[in-house]
Every structure is written in C-alpha cells, then in structure tokens.
Amino acid sequence: GGPAGDFLSQGGASSEEIMAELEAARKDDNAKAVLIRINTPGGSTGATQEIVEEMDKIKNAGKPIVISMGDTCASAGYWIASKGDYIFASPATLTGSIGVYIDYTNVEGLAGKLGVTDEKIKSGAYKDMLSMYRPMVPEERAMLQGMVNDIYNQFVQSVAEGRHMDVAKVKTFADGRIMTGREAQNLGLVDAMGNYYDALDYAGGLVNMDGDVPVHTYDGGGSLRGFLNADMQHLGTWMGKGFADAVRSSAGTSSVSVR
C-alpha cells in the first residue's frame, strides 16, 4: 500500500522510503542544501514522478539539490537526476536511456505443440491485453503505442524542463541510447565531471559553507542504488535497464518497460 506501493524486491528501495528521506531533508531547518547520490538503472514511472515531486518541494523551499551519479544513472535514474540544480558524473558513468518500450512474450505456438490451451472469462475485450497465449490485435497495438507515446512525452518534457532545454533538442538523443558521463556532459545532460566529494564541496559552496561541510545522512533503509531490483511478478510500467536486458518478460509475466 501507500504511494506507488512497494515496487521492489531483493533489497531495493521503495518510493515511500526515498520520499520519506527527501521530506525529512526538506523539513530539517539545519539542512541548507540536499545532495542526492544516484546509482541505479531505473525504476517505475509512477514512483519516479512521486520522487520528482518531493524534489520540487525541496527546491521550492529554497534548498538547492546537487546530484552525484554513481556507476549507473540511467532511465528513471536520469529522470530523477535531471531535476537537480547541478549534476556531477564520472566520465565513464552510464546514463541516458531516455525512451520507452513494451516487451511481451507470445508462446501461443509452443503452447499448441504442448497441447496447452488458455481459457479466460473476462469483463471486456482488452482485459487480457498482452496475453502470452494469443497474438496482439491491431487495436491493442494502437492503444499500447499511445501509452508509450504519452509516457515518452512526459519523460522528455520533464528532462527538458529540468535541464532548461527545448523539447526538440532533447528528442534528438531521447531514443533509448546509453551514453557515458562525458558524452552526457557534451549534450548538456550533465554539468560537470566529478565524484561524490566534488558534489559535496559544490553543495557546500552553494550555501556559503567553506572547508569541511557538515553532513547529515537521511537513510530510511534503502537507497537509489537499489531503485530497480525487481523480479517482475506483475504487469507494471517500468523505467530502465533495458540496455542490459534486465527488464524482460518471463514465463507467466509481461512487462511494460520505459527506457
């Protein structure tokens, strides 16, 4: 239950945990800036937007947000990062992956050879959309393409707003490609090359803190490091790690993935 549900398994952080940490930072009068370390290939669309909303609240409270990318900050990870005021990455960080795809498995032929039939009682013509036991009909394909286009446009618009770019410019590289941190900087998706401590120093400078910056860590038991570590036990709209084929359909499941 709760916002977006516990959409992860095997040690990943839920959106509830991440939002709670962001809320705590926003309400802490001693917190003058927020540094977010992101090391994730992605997560769910709805949860991503909930996290971004909390980030907007922090910025509206007058607290700057600095992003430090880890090994990977792709897809939903980049969606979140793009809302920061300043983004640091390492030259070899894997990022980008802005785009959307739907993947499902059709085993109708195999099931027929095995003598397996699928019977359903459903309330509407499209209730079993993405069934693995029948081909997709044109009307379903059109519906799903419309959904893909809508989510893609939301993703692109959010990145454009966060990075102060024209939507048309974002679309020139929002085709699902993975890029290095250096390539992302050349495209305007990253501000500077640097590690966590560089980002920490920069955040301190934004609030006129010289020397050692006092840090309080908000950690509700999860982190963006594990933002996507799911076994896809249900149909969902998912951001990310399509480049590593980590979000795939498996027997008995279908996935809608955004990357």
Question: What are the functions of these language-model segments?
Answer:
Residues 72-75, 94-98:
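Short gly/pro/ser/thr-enriched loop/turn and capping motifs at secondary-structure boundaries
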Residues 1-74, 86-89, 102-259:
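N-terminal organellar transit peptides
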Residues 79-86:
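Alpha-helix C-terminal capping segments
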